[in-house]
Amino acid sequence: MKQNKHILFMQEAVREARKGLREGGIPIGSVLVKNGRIIGRGHNRRVQKGSAILHAEMDCLENAGRLAAKDYEQCVIYSTLSPCDMCTGAILLYGIPTVVIGENKTFKGPENYSKKHGVRLINLDLPECKKMMKDFIAAKPKLWNEDIGE
């Protein structure tokens, strides 16, 4: 997939992140794309739902609904931030072959582990994603630390 397509889909993930922020949550968004079409979208809703597990990628996968293994094999998941251990586990479990991330400076999940298991990682290193997280962490450091388990 061409870089500009990745940027377009990442912009949808950014929209999800901004939606989460407007709702009072953590600004991380995700979309699941199959054959050039978004089939799932989500954002971190741990705060909004009082959930321990509703990270953006988990919300996105949940909203995509049940899919066959062959469907996941044709997907790309986009996340505004490097996926954590839990979300990486779901990506590996369902065999999603490609993960496109907005940035990994704020938080770097188990990217090497993903690569060792055959996942292709593309880091767009977008200033917009970094700024969104920097601003959020400056405003709500305690909530951010809770989200990453610190």
Regions found by a protein language model. Name each.
Residues 28-36:
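Short beta-strand scaffold segments in enzyme catalytic cores
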